[in-house]
């Protein structure tokens, strides 16, 4: 409990001046196939509500409906429509969010994806499907699977252009 990547506890790498390891400054560039899953469209809404959780069943169904296949090495981005609230209703934007559940995170990690991101500030649904645990998808992806988490990804242009697969470049 309260462990990070490779089972490390924060006391092993967090100092008052920053991180001694696991810092974003140590991240190598990522160049990979990107896949955008439009979860808002999957649920038939322009924007998902806070607390809407998507897991492996919803991820598989959305990928199938979009006729895309998730593969090892992919960067998977989720469009929920939530990011638009950051401009129009910042208090609501920060009060909760739709997002990935632990089962969905485990599924993606076991596929061998490199990174998972969304147009939300924290990737996990809040409130989530596990009332006793905060950010279980983060824990699954980062600590157990070694998968990078990307937040506040602006997916609106990709959705507007009908893009589902693309070259993802970070770094």
Q: Model-predicted segments: where are they?
A:
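Active-/binding-site microenvironments in catalytic and ligand-binding cores
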Residues: 1-171
């Amino acid at each position: 409990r309260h462990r990070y990547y490779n089972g490390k506890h924060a006391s092993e790498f967090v100092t008052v001046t920053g991180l001694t390891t696991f810092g974003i400054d140590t991240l190598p560039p990522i160049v990979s196939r990107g896949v955008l899953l439009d979860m808002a469209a999957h649920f038939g809404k322009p924007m998902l509500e806070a607390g809407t959780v998507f897991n492996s069943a919803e991820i598989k169904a959305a990928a199938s409906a979009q006729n895309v296949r998730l593969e090892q090495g992919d960067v998977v981005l989720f469009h929920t429509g939530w990011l638009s609230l950051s401009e129009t209703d910042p208090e609501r934007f920060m009060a909760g969010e739709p997002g990935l559940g632990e089962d969905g995170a485990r599924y993606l990690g076991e596929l061998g994806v490199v990174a998972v991101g969304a147009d939300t500030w924290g990737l996990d649904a809040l409130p989530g499907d596990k009332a006793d645990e905060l950010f279980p998808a983060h824990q699954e992806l980062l600590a157990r699977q070694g998968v990078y988490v990307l937040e506040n990804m602006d997916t609106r242009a990709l959705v507007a252009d009908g893009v589902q697969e693309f070259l993802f470049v970070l770094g």
